């Protein structure tokens, strides 16, 4: 992932950041044991063929919460077109409360943005997008469109069971 980011997205690690490539759940658990706190956590462990079910559960999200502070942000790249959607959404909502859903109509993906504190108001998101607009436009990233696509609307079945270490049939639910 890092080499792809460097080659195609001009990513460069700096002295102000640390990048780790590791199995997510053991890494998160070790970080919690060491009382480490992270500002920005990216969860992008899913492929079209397989979902690591142990990274979908309430227990895992509680471990993620333990390494966050009030300013930290969790960004999870996941799916929007399977039976898993309702279960996963209920699980995130119970772990974080309200979260942002970012979906593009042309894909089956969604990005979940969650934090411990209440989500920022849309006007703040628009202001932040404007700050980055010039630098990102040269890469074809229409960041000014994104704040309007962030939704907190509950579009899932709230009666669905949350995913836990004891109940996580993610790969079965992934089937359409």
Name the predicted role of every residue range.
Residues 3, 52, 85, 122-125:
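Generic domain-boundary/flexible-linker signal
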Residues 17-18, 53, 76, 104, ...:
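Short linear functional motifs in flexible/disordered or boundary regions
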Residues 58-123:
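C-terminal substrate-binding/active-site "lid" region of AdoMet-derived donor-dependent transferases
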Residues 17-21, 80, 108, 130:
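Sparse recognition of residues in long alpha-helices and their boundaries
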Residues 98-176:
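Soluble small-group transferase modules, centered on the S-adenosyl donor enzyme superfamily
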Residues 7, 34, 89, 114, ...:
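Surface-exposed beta-strand edges and their flanking turn/coil or helix-capping segments
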Residues 14-16, 71, 96-98, 138-140:
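A generic structural signal for alpha->beta connector loops
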Residues 1-70:
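The AdoMet/dcAdoMet-binding core of the Class I SAM-like
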């Amino acid at each position: 992932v890092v080499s792809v980011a460097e080659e195609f997205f001009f990513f460069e690690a700096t002295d102000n950041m640390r990048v780790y490539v590791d199995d997510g759940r053991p890494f998160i658990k070790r970080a919690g044991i060491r009382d480490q706190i992270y500002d920005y956590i990216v969860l992008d462990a899913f492929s079209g063929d397989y979902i690591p079910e142990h990274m979908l559960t309430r227990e895992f999200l509680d471990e993620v919460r333990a390494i966050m502070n009030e300013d930290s942000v969790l960004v999870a790249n996941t799916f929007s077109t399977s039976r898993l959607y309702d279960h996963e959404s209920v699980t995130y909502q119970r772990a974080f409360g309200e979260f942002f859903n970012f979906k593009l109509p042309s894909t089956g993906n969604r990005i979940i943005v969650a934090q411990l504190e209440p989500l920022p108001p849309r006007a703040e998101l628009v202001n932040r997008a404007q700050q980055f607009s010039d630098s990102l436009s040269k890469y074809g990233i229409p960041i000014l469109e994104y704040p309007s696509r962030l939704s907190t609307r509950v579009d899932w079945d709230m009666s669905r069971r949350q995913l836990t270490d004891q109940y996580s049939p993610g790969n079965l639910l992934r089937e359409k």
